[in-house]
Amino acid sequence: MSDILFIADFFADQVPGGGELNNEVLVEKLYKRGHTVRKVNSHLVKHMDLLCNKNIIVSNFVNLSEDNKKELQSKNYIIYEHDHKYLPGRNPGVYPEYCAPKEDIINRQFYAKAKAVLCQSQFHANIARKNLELDNIVSLGGNLWSDKHLGILEEICKDPQRQDRHAIIMSNTKHKNTAGAIN
């Protein structure tokens, strides 16, 4: 089995967001398969971290330095994409047909040099492909869920008082548009 360096802005024990929870499930699955996973916050990544690790997963990387992004481009890394970090606002929905003008695309070389860019759905992958024009984009076909969270969802679905209802999760993250969902 291999050693894996897992880079993300935050982890689930720091911020319980959707991307962070997905990362945690992935890390657990890797542990169960015998891999050693070392988690490092993106703003704490050092040159030696990149030098000493052959297999790297980069998740949310807003806080990753430009120098580290450049150095990673000569390494064996994949991007586990939770949103659209090739756009300054990370929301392709503000563009016609979800297609941003070329001058709005950022981090393209970082995506291009990745062995793969793993997107959470076919819709997500199609939008990323349309904007980045890359062949290394892959759809995972959905999110990763822990058994605990799947159990909670199953229980909610069994409750007749909760049928035919919906929920909006509060988020202060601008591109998630919580206010728009409420209105």
Predicted regions and their residues:
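Membrane-proximal helix-turn-helix segments that form the acceptor-binding/catalytic region
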Residues: P96-V117, N126
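Active-site proximal beta-strand in glycosyltransferases
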Residues: N55-V58, L72-P101, L118
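Short hydrophobic "strand-cap" motifs at the C-terminus of beta-strands
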Residues: I7, Q120, I168-N172
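Short beta-strand->alpha-helix junction loop in the catalytic core
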Residues: S139-E155
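Short, conserved loop/helix-junction motifs that constitute active-site signature segments
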Residues: K69-K75, R108-K113, P160-Q161
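Conserved catalytic-core segment of nucleotide-activated headgroup transferases in glycan assembly
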Residues: I152-N183
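N-terminal pre-catalytic "stem/leader" segment of glycosyltransferase-like enzymes
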Residues: M1-N63
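A short, active-site helix/loop in glycosyltransferases that binds the activated sugar's phosphate group
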Residues: A112-I137, L144-S146
